[in-house]
Amino acid sequence: LLLEAYYDTGNLLIDPYVGKPVSIIDKELLMPIFREDEPVVRLLPFSSMGEKNGLVEALTVEELYIKEGKKERQILQAVIALGSPSLFQKKEYQMILNCHLL
């Protein structure tokens, strides 16, 4: 799955179960990949300006590649939260990268 992403310095979400930074993807883009097998998701607590005590579904993917220009980085066992499609409406990106992945 190839998509545009945005580094968000305000995305400080860390998975409390595995201690890894969490990036957010448009849920509708990711779910078709899991047609036959339901992904194993867990609920992560989060707080934001709009939601003080929220929960978001997240999963761990084997690898995530981040490409900037000619440089490419591989993140193993990356944690991805499943964001609401409305979060990405009228945006030029489909994923919000955690600032700790810079």
Model-derived segments and their meaning:
Residues 1-102:
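Pepsin/retropepsin-fold aspartyl endopeptidases
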